[in-house]
Amino acid sequence: MVHMHITAWALGLILFFVAYSLYSAGRKGKGVHMGLRLMYIIIIVTGVWLYLDQTIVDKSYHMWYGLKMLAGILVIAGMEMVLVKMSKNKATGAFWGLFIIALVAVFYLGLKLPIGWQVF
C-alpha cells in the first residue's frame, strides 16, 4: 500500500505541474485537472488506509501520522486552489505558500516516520 500511495503522489504532482503549465500557456487544462482530481481520491484513500493500518499496529506514532495526514490534505487543498485560481486568472500567491509549506512538512514527516525512508 505504501508503494501505491507514493506512486499516486508522484503522479499527482506530475499532473499538477502539467495542468499548471497548460493554464499558464492559456490553453485548456480541464482534462488533466480532472485526472488530477481522480488522483486526489486515490491519494486520500490510500493515505487513510495507511494511517489506520499503522495506528492499529503501533499507537506510539498516532499523533505524528495524524499531523502528516493533515499536512497531506493541505497539500491537496493548495494544489487544487492554485489550479482553480489559475483557471480564473486570479492571484495564487497565498495558495502557493500553503502548497510549498505543507509539501515540505509532508516530505519531512514522510522521511522521519517509521513507514517511510529513514533519512533523518
UniProtKB/Swiss-Prot annotation:
Recorded GO CC terms: plasma membrane
Membrane topology of this protein: Multi-pass membrane protein
Protein biosynthesis listed as a keyword: no
Transmembrane segments: 6-26, 32-52, 64-84, 91-111
Keyword terms of this UniProt record: Cell membrane, Membrane, Transmembrane, Transmembrane helix
Primary location class: membrane
InterPro entries xrefs: UPF0344
Cell location: Cell membrane
Pfam families per UniProt: DUF1516
Similarity field: Belongs to the UPF0344 family.
HAMAP family, alphabetized: UPF0344 (MF_01536)
Name of the featured protein: UPF0344 protein BCAH187_A1308
Gene source species: Bacillus cereus (strain AH187)
